[in-house]
Amino acid sequence: MTLLELTVVILVLLTLITVLFFGAQAWKRGSDRALCIIHIHNVQKGMRSYSNLYGFSPGANAPNLQSQIIGLGRVIETTPTCPGGGNYTFGQTYGVDTVPPMGTLYMECSLSSSFQHLPNVTPDW
């Protein structure tokens, strides 16, 4: 094999490795986004279940709502963490102890705008 052929083979291999890294990075971002949305959905379900069980209507004040949903022996055992490195905030729009109206998220991710860690459709949530 000549030096030129060897150089071409190395360049092709490096190009393929580069494409592989970009693909893996895109896959990781997508899986982080999906898991983040699952966390948001689970907390939303837990909040709705708690409010239905104890008779809190949307917009009502539910004392210690976050600690009633998340914790040992609760609907969600541990506080979720965003796999993409974002931070979750609870009750950002209506308050931590207020049951939000239907279609409004109780927990939001700080990466919702930059990495789209936000569900596309939430009217029934």
PLM segments and residue spans:
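Short linear sequence motifs
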Residues: L14, L20, V43, P80-P83, ...
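Conserved hydrophobic/amphipathic alpha-helical signal-anchor segments
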Residues: I17-Q68
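Single, functionally critical "micro-switch" positions that shape active/binding sites
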Residues: L4, I38, G84
